[in-house]
């Protein structure tokens, strides 16, 4: 997990999030995953799986975005220093206690449950989660 503490004017400031980033021109989701994992962690992923797509919406000035959610169970290399925050391997119990976006707990729970591929919509009003829809069914 990445503890976002190094970027200025960061909407994720002091939250724990997964690694990731924006697509570059002509990149597929898995190409973006491999590039971002290498850039942010120094690790080369050797085994991964796409687990779902999360749609983030907001009632504020941010337009929202789509996130392809992957898990990896194989990698090579050593963790390096990240310029966006502090990288740490964390246990599930410890992760549950860390500050993160409210909606992140929903998809983290789905990952821990090894749920099949899912579509999740998360709508925020500022920092507050106001709607969550999982596979077309409103859950919050």
Task: Tell me what each language-model feature is.
Residues 52:
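Catalytic phosphate/metal-binding cores of nucleic-acid and nucleotide-processing enzymes, i.e., regions
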């Amino acid at each position: 997990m990445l503890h976002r503490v190094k970027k200025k004017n960061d909407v994720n400031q002091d939250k724990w999030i997964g690694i990731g980033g924006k697509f570059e021109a002509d990149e597929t989701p898995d190409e973006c995953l491999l590039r971002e994992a290498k850039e942010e962690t120094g690790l080369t992923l050797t085994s991964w799986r796409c687990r779902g797509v999360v749609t983030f919406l907001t009632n504020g000035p941010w337009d929202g975005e789509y996130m392809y959610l992957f898990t990896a169970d194989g990698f090579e290399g050593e963790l390096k220093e990240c310029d966006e925050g502090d990288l740490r391997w964390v246990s599930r119990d410890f992760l549950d206690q860390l500050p993160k976006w409210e909606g992140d707990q929903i998809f983290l729970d789905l990952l821990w449950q090894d749920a099949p591929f899912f579509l999740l919509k998360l709508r925020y009003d500022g920092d507050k989660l106001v709607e969550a829809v999982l596979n077309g069914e409103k859950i919050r």
